[in-house]
Amino acid sequence: MRGFSNEIILKRTLTLSDFTLRYHKRGITALQVIKAPSVSNVPVLLSGDNYGYFVMWDLVTKRPITHIEIEGNSHIIAFWWVETTNVLYILSKDSMLRIFELDSSTQLSIDLVRKLSQANKTDHLQWTKIYEMPINTLNFANFIIEAEVKPTKDNKSYRLVCCHTDDSETIDIYQIIEDSTFKLKRPFNNINFPRFLKQQNFLGISKDSKFGIIMRFAKLNDVIFLGYENGFVVGFKITFDEGLQRDIAELVHVSNDHYPNPILDMCVSGDELYSCSTDDFITKYKIPVNLQLETKYLRDDALLIKCPSSLRVSEPSKVHLPLKNIGHIDKVKDDYLVVSSWSGMTIVYNMRTSEVEQTFVKSKNNLVVSDSSMGDLTNGSGSNTESSSKSHNYKVGAMTCLESFDVQSDGLRLGQLRRIKALAKCNWCLIGYEDGTIKLNKI
């Protein structure tokens, strides 16, 4: 699929959206589908925009459940919901990570569908801000929250992996202890993987070369992945080092297939990691669930980093697409890869058949009258190329997917069950646009 044929394929597979969610007045910047049993017995959608509005949506009624307005109306970059404690982490462009707790005394019944009349009210759930801390957000990177391996019975403990406060090429790892006082520790400060790789002469990387800022984080099992501005992807896990008698970062993955282009997004599915950039392909890495135990390591105790002496650059498989400048990716079931480009196009790609099955766009419909004697209406561009579509398609600010799921019918009336099954039986692609709308599309 190359050249003009790409345009024919994309136009032929254009698909209308099934639903539109309207509440945001500014561009959507973050989307995530989560399970929140304390709020709903079906998945809910989280959305954020560039004016500091966070919204939790009921996907059955297509209405907001609750919202938060970030002080200063700061651009929301990413969020993370911790289901076990009803705590929400929101990272904003003002370089602050704010942590909110959902007041348990005002939560909805777990059987939300019996209270559909409440679904259009956004003030019946109360959020309490319990902490805030500075994080470097120069790069618009997201962050990772993971449960500690050994929580205690008296409190819950989590790791926060994020950009270092000052150096956007390095990371910090915090330990968050959620008890009556909410404690915060920083066992890892300024972990510098680029410096380590250059010291070890990995790939013959010049000591003067720059990895650039960290663009994205992803997590697969116990491995955290960092995508850099220069196209490198680094994966590590936290392991206990007998010699130092403390935890250190162990490198288990290095790849550079997008070099020198920046990593724009990453996602995981099963034991696979997917990454994208300004190229016209997606890379797919198969990550072993149980990594082999090693006996020989390269290490720098000052940096608190080690890697197996056998570590080599990972060889991926590539999925070539009729789009480039791919800003968002997600995986649905086993076969479908969903990608959004800077042009405003989102495609559903069947990896088994190597075909584009659906294309979603939201057009600005800027119609102009041609001076030609033939007299036609156009969208203001005489070109059918992907690059020209940037001017007449709304940009995609965020994209995520929801896979079909099973429904527990206990206690549901027939009408309620029908509405939930209509959502549950399908796979969905949810796209947030720069005009503040969120489109729901059946896959």
From Swiss-Prot:
Keywords annotated in UniProt: Chromatin regulator, Nucleus, Repeat, WD repeat
List the SUPFAM superfamilies: WD40 repeat-like
Q: Where is the composition biased (Low complexity)?
A: 378-391
Localization, UniProt: Nucleus
UniProt repeat feature WD, residue ranges: 23-67, 71-110, 258-295, 318-359
State any GO BP term from the record.
chromatin organization
- What segment(s) does the record annotate as region Disordered? 372-391
Q: Please give the InterPro entries that the UniProt record associates with this protein.
A: WD40/YVTN_repeat-like_dom_sf, WD40_repeat_dom_sf
One GO cellular component this record assigns the protein to is: nucleus
| Superkingdom of this protein's organism | Eukaryota
Keyword Repeat, does the record have it? yes
**Is Glycosyltransferase there in the keyword field?**
no
Q: What does it do? A: Component of the ASTRA complex involved in chromatin remodeling.
Query: What quaternary structure, including any partners, is listed in this protein's UniProt entry?
Result: Component of the ASTRA chromatin-remodeling machinery complex composed of at least ASA1, RVB1, RVB2, TRA1, TEL2, TT1 and TTI2.
The protein's matches in PANTHER family, at most eight in alphabetical order, are given as: GUANINE NUCLEOTIDE-BINDING PROTEIN SUBUNIT BETA-LIKE PROTEIN 1, TRANSDUCIN BETA-LIKE 3
**What is the protein name given in its UniProt record?**
ASTRA-associated protein 1
